Design a protein with these regions (language model features):
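Bacterial N-terminal signal peptides
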Residues: 7-18
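Positively charged n-region of N-terminal signal peptides that target proteins for export
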Residues: 1-7
Length: 144
C-alpha cells in the first residue's frame, strides 16, 4: 500500500512539474528584468562574425559575398548601427523562435527597424515590429 501511495505521489509530482514547465514556456517577455525600451534603430543587416572580429567594419560597407557565406554557414544575423552596436533579432514569445526569416530579405541593406530593444551587460537584442529599407543610405560592397 505504501508503494502504491508513493507511486501516485510521484505521478502527481511529475504532472505538476510538466504543467508548470509548459506554462513557463508560454509566457512572453512581460516581467523581464532586462533593460528594455521601445526604439527605432537604423543599420546594416549582416552576419555578426566580421563586425565582432574587425573593429574597422562600418554600417555602410561590407562584402556581400562574405556576409552571405557566413549566414549560409550559420553565423547569427544582426543589425549593425553606425555607432557600432549590434542588435540581434529575438521573438516576443518563449521559447524563442527563429527570427532570421524576418531579416534575410534585407541582408546587405540599410534598414530602419522599430520594436522593443533589450540590453543586458552590453548585449543588445530587438523584437522587431516594423522594418523597412532606408533608400537614401548607400551601402558599399567591397567585394571579397
Amino acid at each position: 500500500m505504501k508503494n502504491l501511495i508513493s507511486g501516485v505521489l510521484i505521478i502527481f509530482a511529475l504532472i505538476a512539474t510538466s504543467t508548470g514547465t509548459a506554462t513557463a514556456q508560454k509566457t512572453s517577455m512581460e516581467g523581464s528584468r532586462a533593460n528594455r525600451s521601445k526604439v527605432t534603430i537604423e543599420g546594416l543587416v549582416r552576419d555578426v562574425a566580421c563586425p565582432i572580429q574587425n573593429l574597422d567594419g562600418t554600417a555602410t560597407s561590407m562584402s556581400l559575398k562574405c556576409v552571405t557565406d557566413c549566414l549560409k554557414g550559420g553565423s547569427p544575423i544582426a543589425i549593425l548601427t553606425k555607432d557600432g552596436d549590434l542588435y540581434l533579432p529575438i521573438s516576443d514569445k518563449m521559447p524563442d523562435y527563429d527570427q532570421r526569416t524576418k531579416l534575410m530579405p534585407f541582408v546587405g541593406k540599410y534598414v530602419r527597424a522599430t520594436g522593443i530593444a533589450f540590453e543586458r551587460n552590453g548585449a543588445r537584442a530587438i523584437v522587431i515590429s516594423e522594418i523597412a529599407e532606408v533608400n537614401d543610405v548607400k551601402v558599399r560592397d567591397e567585394g571579397e
